[in-house]
A protein has these predicted regions:
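Structural signature of nuclease core domains in nucleic-acid processing machines
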Residues: 1-105
Length: 105
């Protein structure tokens, strides 16, 4: 967790972009921009949290897919990694590229 919450990361970052003919906007709970990749972390409070990726609510996967698409336009050439932080357990769960691609706008 240290790097995701360290001095190089930012909290509560507004995001606006265009995906196709749609304007999308949101607020990133946490973002870490590195040389070759971008991490976006969204805090979730589900009780109990999902144990496996297949149990993650579809609306969360779609939200992260939208963030990923918008951030890919802002940071071309960098891998965008989407992570959910289940706050009740302080547990990170990265959403797979396959699942994000399937939910992409």
């Amino acid at each position: 967790f240290a790097e995701l919450f360290g001095p190089g990361s930012r909290a509560e970052v507004p995001l606006t972009g265009r995906i196709g003919d749609q304007i999308v906007s949101g607020q990133l709970d946490r973002i870490l921009v590195k040389e070759n990749e971008v991490w976006v972390i969204d805090f979730k409070t589900n009780r109990p949290p999902p144990r496996i990726e297949a149990q993650v609510p579809e609306v969360y996967v779609r939200q992260m897919a939208i963030y990923r698409t918008a951030l890919s336009q802002i940071y071309p050439g960098r891998r965008v990694r989407c992570v959910l932080l289940w706050t009740v357990e302080a547990r990170l769960m990265e959403i797979s590229e396959e699942l994000l691609e399937a939910a992409a706008p």
